[in-house]
Amino acid sequence: MTEENKIEKLSDLDFNKFKTLANDESLSRYEKIGFFNHFREGKEAQIWDDIQSKVLTLSMENARVLDIGPGCSDLPFMLLKNAEEKGQNVVLIDSQEMLNQLPDFSFCEKFSAMFPNETKQWSKENKNAFHAIICYSVFHYIAVESSVELFVESICELLAPGGIALIGDIPNVSKRNRFFSSEEGVQFHQNNHGPNSFPEINWNEKKPGEFNDDDVFSILKMARENGVEAFVLPQNNALPMANRREDILFVKHK
């Protein structure tokens, strides 16, 4: 497969296109979830460590854990191994095509659906049920095809008292622009694109699936209005996209 063909395959992604990627045997496990190999291969253990450092309820024995859009790279395998060791119950929500890439376990329920559009009744039936919720690297796709308000309301509803939700790896164009406006950012860009190249910075442009500071702050406001504490957290600097992505954490009081 040529590099041009691969770029085309990994562009303009949505729920249905991810189904196609999941069944494409010419792609690696990282490419099936929309990443070129160099962004994820050999790096997901560090990502998992960063997730665990924020979602402290993942260390609980017998916890109920929900992963929205787990994909099929190394991360869901790490989550499932952790769950098996701690006697946790896991629910994975994704397309059937993506879920088929993951092993079956007695402690894991696979739910084929588009969250939150197709899970409204399920969310009501599982109110206050989950001690840990993870939605990593997929929220910007969900936001294009669904209501951000419905997503936030559903997460807040599903969280158990004392539960923690991580909406992780959110691309923030404002954060990106700040980085590439700095000497460090220009050097980073030139290391990857050549010494005569300069990063494009447009403070007034936001593409579909991108968030800016206003969007991030509005998500915090929505969660807090739903009775849940909400925070913006940086990623570990060792992570591949830490200089232009960030995480949001929800915490429900006991």
Language-model segments: which ranges?
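Class I SAM-dependent methyltransferase SAM/SAH-binding core
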Residues: 72-119
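Conserved beta-strand signature within the Rossmann-like core of class I S-adenosyl-L-methionine
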Residues: 162-169
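Conserved class I S-adenosyl-L-methionine
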Residues: 62-71
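N-terminal, positively charged/glycine-rich alpha-helical extensions of SAM-dependent methyltransferases
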Residues: 1-33
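A short, conserved alpha-helix within the catalytic core of class I
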Residues: 142-154
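C-terminal alpha-helical "lid/dimerization" subdomain adjacent to the S-adenosyl-L-methionine
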Residues: 171-223, 234-237
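A conserved beta-strand element that flanks and buttresses the S-adenosyl-L-methionine
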Residues: 134
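Class I SAM-dependent methyltransferase Rossmann-like catalytic core
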Residues: 20-55
